[in-house]
Structures are given as structure tokens and as C-alpha cells.
Amino acid sequence: MAQAMLLMMPGVSTTNTIDLKRNALLKLQIQKIKPKSSTSNLFFSPLPSSSSSSSTVFKTLALFKSKAKAPKKVEKPKLKVEDGLFGTSGGIGFTKENELFVGRVAMIGFAASLLGEGITGKGILSQLNLETGIPIYEAEPLLLFFILFTLLGAIGALGDRGRFVDEPTTGLEKAVIPPGKDVRSALGLKTKGPLFGFTKSNELFVGRLAQLGFAFSLIGEIITGKGALAQLNIETGVPINEIEPLVLLNVVFFFIAAINPGTGKFITDDEEED
């Protein structure tokens, strides 16, 4: 009846009634599909506005600490001379290895001169005259050059680049004396290596002393005309025959020190350990 009345009303068209029906059906379908308010808050939370996002402040926390920067390596300048008296950077190309060789020659020469003076009673220059037949005054320039070279070499003025480094003494092979059948092993000494605990630095020091002794004995013989032992007699007043054991011990020591290789190795400036 209501529908018939609506149809018979002059101001209401049939199209409007159909639209109302459709709108009512759409509302029912939307209500069925639309979720509840509690679930909608969970899944469909509204995006924060620009005002709220600007007011909130986010704090970032680092899980891992930043790595500390390694300190910069400071390179030390390499010195060309280790302990030269005049600070010459190499001089004439003289190294400690060359100086060690000159020191060994000086030890052998000084020991031989003392032994020759003990046998012949004459000094180094007189023995040289006997061996060569050359008068001393003709060899004076050569002697002066030799004395000057020996003195400068003894004080390190010719340049002493490089240095000697002792070999490591740790380890089982160094600590235990290996068994053997020779005399040295029977006495409890090492079968290999140097007989004494002499290093190349010790040998260099003894060589410098031999160079100084050789040079000053030559200077003294030029002034006094007597050898090293006679000069010692003049200085101390002790007869030579009373100090013969000491002289022989000195000669033997210089010979052994000259021929016995010391431990250690020579390192130049270019081979310096990093």
C-alpha cells in the first residue's frame, strides 16, 4: 500500500524510490564489511600529523662503539753515524766492520812487535829497518801517515756507520751443550762458535786499544829511540825481565783476540730493523 501510494504521488518519481533502495542496501553492506572499533584501532591507526611528528624526538642508540683511531707512527730519523767523535756521516766510507778488521790487524801487529822486541831487544822501527834495510828517515812520511790513520781510526773520526747486534742467546740449542768427543767438549766448552764470550763489540774495543798502543809506541820510539818495552821500563822503572810473564800474557791475549771470531752480526744503516 505504501509503495502504491508513493507511486501515485505526483511529486515522487520511480527513479527516486529505486535510489533509496540502493542506498539502504549499500549502507547494510558497508556495515557488514566495516570492522569493529577495537580492531580498527590496532590495524588502521591513523598517521601522525605534522604537528605531532615535529614534537616527538627520536633518540638513536649505537649498539657497537666506534673504533678508536690508531696513533700515527712517528718515524725517527736514521743517524748515519753511531758514535763518531767528529760526527762525520760516513767519512771515507769507513764502517764498523772495516774498523774491526783494522783493529784485528793492529792487535796482531802490536803483539808481534812486543814479541820481536822481547827477542831482539829493538823496537818496531828498528825491526822494520832490520827486515827491509830502509833507513827510518826515508820512511818518515809513511810512518806519519800510518800514525795519523791509526789514531783517527781508533777514536772513530773516519766515520763508523752501522753497528753490531748481539745474537739471541735464547732457545734449547743455545742453553744445552751438545755432546762431543773433542777437547773443548770434554772441558765443558762449546764445540762450535767462539771459545770465549767475546762479542764483536768487545773485539772492536780491544782493537781500538791496540791501535792506540801501536800508534803511541811508534811516537815514543821516534822521540826516544826505544821500543814499547823499553819505554815501559823508563816510565815505571821495573826491569823487563821481571814483567816477562805479564808481557807474554799480553801477547797471547792479543793473538787470541785477533783470530777468535766474536759473536754478533753487523747491521748497516740501510738494514736497520723496522
UniProtKB/Swiss-Prot annotation:
Pfam families per the UniProt record, alphabetical: Chloroa_b-bind (PF00504)
Transit peptide per record: 1-69
Gene3D superfamilies: Chlorophyll a/b binding protein domain
Cell location: Plastid, Chloroplast thylakoid membrane
Swiss-Prot/TrEMBL keywords: Chloroplast, Membrane, Photosynthesis, Photosystem II, Plastid, Repeat, Thylakoid, Transit peptide, Transmembrane, Transmembrane helix
Signal peptide start and end residues: none
GO terms, biological process: photosynthesis
Molecular function as annotated in GO: identical protein binding; phosphoprotein binding
GO cellular component, one term: chloroplast thylakoid membrane
UniProt KW Repeat keyword: yes
InterPro entries: Chloroa_b-bind
Transmembrane domains' residue ranges: 105-125, 139-159, 204-224, 239-259
Post-translational modification: The N-terminus is blocked.
Membrane disposition: Multi-pass membrane protein
Sequence repeats: 64-167, 168-273
PANTHER family: UPF0041 BRAIN PROTEIN 44-RELATED
Function of the molecule: Seems to be involved in non-photochemical quenching, a process maintains the balance between dissipation and utilization of light energy to minimize generation of oxidizing molecules, thereby protecting the plant against photo-oxidative damage.
Family (UniProt): Belongs to the ELIP/psbS family.
Protein name, entry field: Photosystem II 22 kDa protein, chloroplastic
Native organism: Spinacia oleracea (Spinach)
Upper lineage: Eukaryota, Viridiplantae, Streptophyta, Embryophyta, Tracheophyta
